[in-house]
Amino acid sequence: MSDETRVGEAAEQAATPEKIRKGSARRERGNRTGFTTGACSAAAARAATLGLLLSEVPDTVICRLPNGQEQAFAVTDGCVEESSGLAHAVIIKDAGDDPDATHGAHMTADVRLLPDRAGEIVLKGGFGVGVVTKDGLGLEVGGPAINPVPRRNILDNVRAVAGELLDHDGLEVTISVPGGDEMAKKTLNARLGILGGISILGTTGIVRPYSTAAFRASVVQAVDVAAKQGQTSVVFTTGGRTEKFAMRQLPDLDESCFVQMGDFVKAAFSSAIKHKLPTVYVGAMVGKLTKMCQGLAVTHAWKAEVDRDILADSAREVGAPDDLIEEIRSAETARFAAERLASLGLAVTFHRQLAIKAIRSLKDKYPGNYRLAVLVCDFEGQFICRVNEDEAL
């Protein structure tokens, strides 16, 4: 996968992963697709360019998305200042049913004539569009966080309608997002080295609700950034609570070392191995830890249930009574086992057994020249144990 594809497919704004469980009203609210920041920016730029050409910004604009689809967008706040050769247009982003941090953003384009620069189109980032400060994103450091696919799409849409405007003059297109600096605080942009605003993203132009492909790509991207910064360790966690726990346990590591892999174990480890990172940590609780013991590439509940035999066998190995072992074998959740064993004072030894099995499974599935350690916490994010690979192999 190319840098352009990988970065473009990263979760729209690489939003902090949030677990929305099956059955939740938020999860069940629908599958309506929406549009990426890149598609909305291209539509705004096309509308503003038409404004310069026609002396009036249209109320609706037809934009060609990166996937080739022709899509109508409603245009707001359109205006033209003919005396200064400037046109302005806004598209309000609709992310569909996806819980997108940038839903409702006012994607704004200002298009200005560049006298005597025939055929030239210059694309800039304005307020609310992040600035790239770190390598690893496939973008120029110091430039705007406008990814390659939407960058081309914006320029293509402008050129498609500019017509005679480009015969003698050029065009400067500035994309901005009012409030983008605040939206960015709800994303992982700062950790990736994108500061001051959101990213302009999207390889197809379409946002699909709860896209697992986007989440997986964001994991790969985060590892790329850590490696390009010269980090020698990466810490994979299964969510926000385990990440906070891992950060407390490893306070000397830079924030960029911490990657919420969610359910995407294979994507995380494959990326770390590709970059030859010498040290890998995993932070997890009992459920995901058990699924790592199972060797699952994706640990989501929809992919596979927790193997209760692993839980029961581990309980037996640490001395749990026979009746409890059978209860664990027929229980609905891994949490049941963890809590019952904790009540018997067996929490540490039980979780150590699981961590040892997880290390063996992970090293078998993802061989490479790296050292692995597993950090385990309880459901409140409190430390239970740490197991290094030399204790397991």
UniProtKB/Swiss-Prot annotation:
Span list, region Disordered: 1-35
Entry keyword set: Cobalamin biosynthesis, Methyltransferase, S-adenosyl-L-methionine, Transferase
Pathway of action: Cofactor biosynthesis; adenosylcobalamin biosynthesis; cob(II)yrinate a,c-diamide from sirohydrochlorin (anaerobic route): step 6/10
Gene3D superfamilies attached to this UniProt entry: CbiD-like (3.30.2110.10)
Top-level EC class: transferase
Catalytically driven reaction(s): Co-precorrin-5B + S-adenosyl-L-methionine = Co-precorrin-6A + S-adenosyl-L-homocysteine
Any matching Pfam family: CbiD
The protein's name in its UniProt record: Cobalt-precorrin-5B C(1)-methyltransferase
Species name: Dechloromonas aromatica (strain RCB)
